[in-house]
């Protein structure tokens, strides 16, 4: 039991630390990726077909049974309420305004835009990043929670050896993942 608890505790503490750094102590609400879709439709469509967008589904009983068995997990168990899984399979779990459960916060199921780009409750509102304000300044939205530069530390909160699906010699290849991308990237229409 000790072996399982300590790594999971490190994951939770690490996530809280990085999220705390990205918001500089401010609390911003999570709004869900559907809000990002309004302005970033092509990116949203690209992301919605990724493993990250649909990663919550693997927590359901019977999903990826072979991989779960190989990892020492019970393939028949429902992991959709397991706190040690929700940290990396939902958006904002354990954070103020983050994922609570499927019924309460269905818009935060899966790894959404805000897991990488920060909780959007402030930066998608007036006077910041809105359809009415197409000339917002990037520095202004970064100051209110947008994470503009994705770092290896942010990714490694979940992509690490604490995952039951990788071995102890697993190394997350940030360069390859960044090159591959989580969603297609399209040029912005307006200068920021």
Region locations from a protein language model:
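Generic low-complexity segments that are intrinsically disordered, proline-rich and/or Lys/Arg-biased
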Residues: 8-9, 188
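A contiguous, mid-protein "functional segment" used to position or interact
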Residues: 148-166
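Sequence context of c-type cytochrome heme-c attachment sites
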Residues: 22-110, 114, 120-149, 169-192
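N-terminal secretory signal peptides that target proteins for export/translocation
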Residues: 1-7
